[in-house]
Amino acid sequence: MKSILRSTTRNLITSSRRFENLKTTEEIRNFLAESTWSINELLKSPTGSSQPEVSPEIVKKMLKLSGLNDLKDDQSVTKALNLQMMFINHLYDNDHETVTPSPKRNENNGIFRLLASDHLPQRPLELNNLLKQINELKPDPSKGEVDFTISDLQRDSFVINKRKE
């Protein structure tokens, strides 16, 4: 467990700066007020990256799907999305089991992971299919479902006597 924690801690260190000992409250306050790192330190350059870039077409498609109008400043949105994708890829760099999309798949699938239920219409529910599923049901003893018929219930007779009071 310690080795996992140690390796995780090593991955979180972004620079090898040494800081002087902070002794007073004012020194600590001043130190915390200054930004000592930038998210840009963690981002790889988009030119050396093998990831697909977010194209203006994808931005327009996302805006259309979200119900927003086309923006006049598509460039800034595209740049922001590219930076976010680079940062997310940085977070998952240590995960060697990530699946890379095959070239035959849609370009958007490599960028946005959609659940099948989000974009594929389901078959409509029909009465015939429901009746077929009901007929195919079998009782499962592991769930406490016991197989019995109506004749099993009718075998035991119950008599209720009403008393007149």
UniProtKB/Swiss-Prot annotation:
Allows the formation of correctly charged Gln-tRNA(Gln) through the transamidation of misacylated Glu-tRNA(Gln) in the mitochondria. The reaction takes place in the presence of glutamine and ATP through an activated gamma-phospho-Glu-tRNA(Gln). Required for proper protein synthesis within the mitochondrion. Belongs to the GatF family. The lineage of its organism: Eukaryota, Fungi, Dikarya, Ascomycota, Saccharomycotina. Keywords: ATP-binding, Ligase, Membrane, Mitochondrion, Mitochondrion inner membrane, Nucleotide-binding, Protein biosynthesis, Transit peptide. It is found in: Mitochondrion inner membrane. The keyword Mitochondrion applies. It catalyses: L-glutamyl-tRNA(Gln) + L-glutamine + ATP + H2O = L-glutaminyl-tRNA(Gln) + L-glutamate + ADP + phosphate + H(+). Pfam families: GatF (PF20977). Residues 1-19 form a transit peptide. One of its GO terms (biological process) is glutaminyl-tRNAGln biosynthesis via transamidation. It comes from Candida albicans (strain SC5314 / ATCC MYA-2876) (Yeast). InterPro entries: GatF (IPR027499). Signal peptide: none annotated. This is Glutamyl-tRNA(Gln) amidotransferase subunit F, mitochondrial. Its EC number is 6.3.5.-. One of its GO terms (cellular component) is mitochondrial inner membrane. Subunit of the heterotrimeric GatFAB amidotransferase (AdT) complex, composed of A, B and F subunits. It comes from the Eukaryota. HAMAP family: GatF. It is a peripheral membrane protein. GO terms for molecular function: ATP binding; glutaminyl-tRNA synthase (glutamine-hydrolyzing) activity.
